[in-house]
């Protein structure tokens, strides 16, 4: 495979990842809407548990989407490094791609890692805490005027 094919496959993977990311954020918005509506009215334990499970499934999906994005970057970097090692000259853009810090540390053995991208993990951890707080924290008494 040459560098054009490698970068084209990366672009297709990133386009697919972007679609999944938008869908994940939409369904995350739905989960926060469910949690907010549940918080406004009477909530049952079953409702809280179901929304919690729904939210945790969304967080899991978000982690998978982030991990597949990193896998795509690492696979492309590994392919470009193999092309360069075979003696072919890479374009300026491909060389610039390989100088990105997260990319330059990619190994030749590409592995899927759910927790390989710490900013992604921290983001989804914060989202988890926020969602669980909306679901499980007690509602404060409203002040009457």
Q: What is each PLM-predicted segment?
A:
Residues 1-14, 73-79, 83, 108:
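Membrane-interface interhelical loops and short amphipathic "cap" helices
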Residues 1-33:
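Cytosolic-side membrane-entry/anchor segment at the start of a transmembrane helix
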Residues 13-20, 45-52, 114-125:
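Alpha-helical transmembrane segments of integral membrane proteins
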Residues 26-36, 113-145:
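Transmembrane alpha-helical segments in integral membrane proteins
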Residues 39-60:
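Interfacial segments of alpha-helical transmembrane regions
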Residues 57-73:
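C-terminal TM-helix exit segments that contain a strictly Trp-centered aromatic cap at the helix terminus
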Residues 69-101:
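Juxtamembrane non-transmembrane "cap" segments at the membrane-aqueous interface
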Residues 99-116:
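Membrane-proximal, non-transmembrane alpha-helical segments
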């Amino acid at each position: 495979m040459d560098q054009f094919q490698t970068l084209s496959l990366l672009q297709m993977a990133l386009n697919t990842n972007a679609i999944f990311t938008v869908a994940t954020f939409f369904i995350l918005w739905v989960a926060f809407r469910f949690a907010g509506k549940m918080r406004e009215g009477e909530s049952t334990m079953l409702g809280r548990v179901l929304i919690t499970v729904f939210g945790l499934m969304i967080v899991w999906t978000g982690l998978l989407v982030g991990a597949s994005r990193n896998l795509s970057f690492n696979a492309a970097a590994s392919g470009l490094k193999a092309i360069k090692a075979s003696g072919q000259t890479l374009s300026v853009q491909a060389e610039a791609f390989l100088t990105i810090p997260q990319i330059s540390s990619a190994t030749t053995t590409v592995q899927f890692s759910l927790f390989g991208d710490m900013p992604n993990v921290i983001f989804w951890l914060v989202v988890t805490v926020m969602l669980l707080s909306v679901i499980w924290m007690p509602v404060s008494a409203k002040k009457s005027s």
